[in-house]
């Protein structure tokens, strides 16, 4: 996965347990220039971060090259961590049609990698994620990143795109609890 900034967390002591006993969730925040991803394993007392990072594509790259890189990098993450569920950020209203089309293409590259692996795919609107993680649907990116750091007990503040992806995964964990704040829609 050359070119992607990636951090893999050291396995926690409970990592020796069989993978099937703890659900592994992949969150993806798609963008042409910086697609964030975060992989967590549901565990007690809190979820464990397995990997996080940002798939970076320079502005000088053609769109097709970026889309291929997003697909290939996410395919590699899926193969390495074997998630059972993927959560992708839902589409948001964009005033610029060109921006909306480009975002849709990046999202499509991510969805193909997930679908090819036969994974369950859900989407959650950005406001629902912020509401679930911070308690306020219009929260700033920094507030989301700080809460993700706290919830996952990360030593460092995650990059903004990776933080959003981890927030998506955490929102899915919350959505499967009895008192869900953010309902996910299956894609």
What are these model-derived regions, one by one?
Residues 1-187:
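Phosphate- and other anionic-substrate recognition elements at nucleic-acid/protein interfaces
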